[in-house]
Amino acid sequence: MRKYRIVFQKAFKSQMIYRAATLSSAASTLLSFAIQICLWHALLGTGLQSGTSFTDMVLFVIVNTFVSKLTRANIATTIEAAVTDGSIAMELLRPISYKYYLLANIFGKNAFSVMTNVLPVAAVGAFFLGGAEAPEIGSVLAFLVSLVLGVLLMFELTYTFGLLAFRIQRCWFLSWYVSALTTFFGGTAVPLWFYPKALQTVSYVLPFRYVAFEPVNLLLGRTPAGEAWVPILCALAWLLVLGLLDRVMWRSAVQGLTVNGG
């Protein structure tokens, strides 16, 4: 664990160098938050739509912003570059797992992004949540467990798709596919509450809704704390399936690896 902690710390500190980029990213995130809040306020006002209030949507946007910033990764491009220039050979010689090295490196960079981008958004969002009822303790605990699983699930998704870079010469589009599928079937832009029944049914058999949508459901009490085991169990099942799948893909990729460059 100490090795991965060092990787995490170095990745976190490396982001402190780019001050202008940090400021522009924070401003962009705040602007995006403001636009979404204005849109939902125009659509919902102070009333209810399909049982959804404006404060529900504020919380929804804050949680989605947190998850998106914490799980942002372009693993496919990282692996593609390493295979192309031959540096993947050195990566495989490290006395640590390449998967968990990527995990520590990504979370180190993204943790800095959460601090500089999400905390200001949460502070602004708190003004809109002033009159909201506090969630029950059981819902909060279920939310935290589900959120941790959702973050890990999103990493597994990006990592599994990223391993395709060993087989595909140009894979810039893979991250776009992951993002598009998560946005549509994960309900990160428009909540699944507003989807047609058919699409909601499809989303239940895919992993994307368990990344951020189900944690928000638990926090808002739409999924009672007593039924929290259902989405949590589904997230665990998907983590197991993707974990087994990426292990098979990794072994196949390493066995058939041809290093270019050097």
State the predicted function of each range.
Residues 1-262:
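Hydrophobic transmembrane alpha-helices and immediately adjacent juxtamembrane helices
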